[in-house]
Amino acid sequence: MKKTALTIITIASGSLGAVYFLPSEPAVQKDIRATSQHDTSVDNTSPKAFLDYSLSTLGEKPWQTITQDVVSEERALGELQLDEQLFALYLRYKQALADLDIEITGSDITSLETLHQAILDLQREYFSAQQIDLIFGEENQLRALALEKARLSEQGYSAEEQKQLWRDHLALQPEYVQESDANRRLMSELAQGEDAQTTYLKRVELVGEAGAQRLEVLDQNRAEFDRVFQHYLVQRSAILDDLGLSDEQKRQQIKMLRETSFDAKQWRRIEALERIADGG
């Protein structure tokens, strides 16, 4: 718990001195979330989760602002000594990771092992051993566990034998692996099949778990927006094609339709999309 800071005011009068201790106002924690993140909590479950959460605002916030926010959040970074150079390096790593061209063919264990090794090699290109351990240690361990699960499924064991061997293998892992939320989610994904496992591994490694979940929400929001906008265009076209309306009446009805179909903050965007739909 932080100790309350004290402001000391010393007033000297002749040979007498009086010292007053006045409690200062506690520092207000800066909200580093972007506008689109206000319905979420900052993901500081691990240094990597925090870095990925911060990077997901790129394009919405200036790079320099993101960097300053990240570097100032020492509590979320733990032992990781992060500066602007290391954060820029992390972004370059993420870009290189996205460019990895490795074909994954279903449950092919060789493909999964190739992906795992390629990720480890890429990490070594950009980071020291200590940085890799602090940033990627848990996810590397979880990915290795997923590979072990895949190997068990290819060795001819019965379903019950696989479950028992898997439990035995987990019992040998560090406590944080056995108890982590990420591990429980991984176990759920593994139980659904190898295709889900592969998707999980690639998404989490690219953007982190919180980032993957946020992208899924954004995808759903985009799909809903597209549905509403396409319906709006149909109604708008009906107004434009109505020969009984003057140009001014059409303009007013379309304006009313736009304002009742979308939030005020979207109106300028809708007008721009209308121009695109009209061919310019």
UniProtKB/Swiss-Prot annotation:
Membrane topology annotation: Single-pass membrane protein
Q: Can you supply a Gene Ontology BP term from the record?
A: lipid catabolic process
Keywords of this protein's UniProt record, alphabetized?
Cell inner membrane, Cell membrane, Chaperone, Lipid degradation, Lipid metabolism, Membrane, Transmembrane, Transmembrane helix
Q: Which domain of life is it from?
A: Bacteria
Query: For this UniProt entry, which segments traverse the membrane?
Result: 5-22
Q: Which InterPro entries match?
A: Lipase_chaperone
Provide GO CC annotations from the record: plasma membrane
Indicate where this protein resides in the cell: Cell inner membrane
Query: Could you give a GO molecular-function term held by this entry?
Result: unfolded protein binding
Q: Which family does it belong to?
A: Belongs to the lipase chaperone family.
What the protein does?
A: May be involved in the folding of the extracellular lipase during its passage through the periplasm.
Name of the protein in its database record: Lipase chaperone
Query: Which species is the source of this protein?
Result: Vibrio vulnificus (strain YJ016)
Gene designation per UniProt? lifO
